[in-house]
Amino acid sequence: MSAFHLETLKSLPKAEQEAALSEANRQLEEMSAEDRLKWAFDNLSGQFVLSSSFGIQAAVMLHLVTRKKADIPVILTDTGYLFPETYRFIDALTEKLDLNLQVFRAALSPAWQEARYGKLWEQGVEGIERYNDINKVEPMNRALKTLEAGTWFAGLRRDQSKSRSHLPILAIQRGVFKFLPIIDWDNRKIHYYLKEHDLPYHPLWDEGYLSVGDTHTTRKWEEGMSEEETRFFGLKRECGLHEG
């Protein structure tokens, strides 16, 4: 597999671009997560960044990637509505792993947003999507541009939701390479990795949370619920960062 140059690949006719990505993904599927990362650093172009929501199992990707590239920028899009436990978790992991944390926020503060728009998360799917655009999508786009990203690592997994079940390891999204090295991991593998490397779950894991985002759109898991139903009142799974 030869090196991938983003601008060259983006300039190809769509069919050729898809064929090149498909062949790369076919080979990447046979590799371990560690080997996938090595391949990415050896073959993908541009600056590398890693995004993290500092969710329940976030320590896995943070540890896995920073072992390969200690100073990689770690992007957090901070809505201002994260759980207190999440902010403390961010502080703890940043210190433990010596993270190069880069925090991006919306142009308007949470209080100003509420004054202007009301509580967008209480305004149905349209309100949630507008909230996500303001607090997640725009700050992430700005982060990718500011950090001159060419390759974006993320910790999405196929077993997390239906919307992620067919995602490839390598794609082009938002004009950069999107690379998902643990896409085929399950909860068991995640658990063993955390234990092997003495890494913590998010503190709310012990209180019954399977997924953690903002305080106003996150629910504890209850019997009969899917993980998807614990976020955004079950109306949608994605916060916008990993769509489109």
UniProtKB/Swiss-Prot annotation:
NCBIfam families reported for this sequence: cysH, PAPS_reductase, PRK02090.1
Reactions catalysed according to its record: [thioredoxin]-disulfide + sulfite + adenosine 3',5'-bisphosphate + 2 H(+) = [thioredoxin]-dithiol + 3'-phosphoadenylyl sulfate
Protein name per Swiss-Prot or TrEMBL: Phosphoadenosine 5'-phosphosulfate reductase
Organism placement in taxonomy: Bacteria, Pseudomonadati, Pseudomonadota, Alphaproteobacteria, Sphingomonadales
Source superkingdom: Bacteria
Signal peptide: none
One function term, GO molecular function aspect: phosphoadenylyl-sulfate reductase (thioredoxin) activity
Enzyme class: oxidoreductase
Keywords: Cytoplasm, Oxidoreductase
Active site residues according to the UniProt entry: C239 (nucleophile)
GO biological process: hydrogen sulfide biosynthetic process; sulfate assimilation, phosphoadenylyl sulfate reduction by phosphoadenylyl-sulfate reductase (thioredoxin)
Annotated source species: Zymomonas mobilis subsp. mobilis (strain ATCC 31821 / ZM4 / CP4)
